[in-house]
């Protein structure tokens, strides 16, 4: 049973079972991963008291959750779904910034690697449908979420589908969160979602799209990158931080109207 602890920040995202082939053709099979894990690991040196909010099914290894607890994370917000869903992810890295996610059999064979039996039946197209599982999980204090998770002052949402992020924002607004940051999902970073994005950004302090996501969202409303960032900021968030891979970041501060180009 996860131990109760004092927490200052919540991070919400996915926990996944990853199968990775790196640029040198080396495989890393059945590894604990996911947006929640990577974000929490990056935040840990700066924020010690972190609560994790996610969902897993019954096949998710209990020892992975135990390791997170031993690292000092509060895992009481990780909810087990009674319905199984696709937790596996496959990444075949072509270079430091680009990877392929489908046809794992081809990539294992190409690199002369034995195919892991745990990856049998994996199809990339199953993931988007299974992400909707979030929408079927009741996340509230009445349904087992620790009250302390609503008493924090800050929260970050990792990439999740639109309806899930809206659901989590509504949940956090019922508590004491006053600093909310968001990393978007490809699912809604499209031009048809521009007007709906206000629902998510109205109370956010910072928004972290990739350059590709920003262009996909804003290309019908703006042409220049800084103009796109200003358009996003007008939807309610103060800081728009565009992630550009190895090229670093762009940041627009709507409060001061200042622009920054930052190295990696």
What is the predicted function of each stretch?
Residues 204-211:
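A short beta-strand/loop micro-motif in the catalytic core of glycosyltransferases
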Residues 64, 164-172, 195-199:
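A short acidic, amphipathic alpha-helical/loop segment
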